[in-house]
Amino acid sequence: MKVDVLTSGYVSMDHIIKIATPAKVGFTSLVTNKSNSKIFYGGCSVNIAYALCRLGMKAMPVLRVGGDYESNGFKKFLEEGNVPQDGITQIAEEATSVCYLLQDNNNDHITIFYPGAMDGRYAQKMKDSLFETAKLG
């Protein structure tokens, strides 16, 4: 498949969690947003590819996902955005990367990230064919 742009980088199933008070060891902070379990599909390379595809270009992300790729809705999200999935490798025994973004009422942030399938131990040589068919990447 010919593509205009290849993007590379981690994918992330983002969860935005707003808390009433700053996080502190030994104390409980109440979550204030009921959307805290909603997944926001992201990662810079995914966001760029998705936006370019929505603008009519063919942009393909090169990344790894876990065995939960379909059940977490990420595959459907990409399909709905017409994002090519030929550059996606699935690591069945692993989870897709997850990020928990904690924001307190002072707008201070804590980011907690689980690399999952994007962990370096799963890295492998990319196929030359991915680059041979891309105009930019």
Regions found by a protein language model. Name each.
Residues 28-36, 54-136:
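Conserved N-terminal subdomain of the carbohydrate kinase-like
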Residues 1-64, 71-73:
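Glycine-rich phosphate/adenosyl-contacting loop at the front of the ribokinase-like
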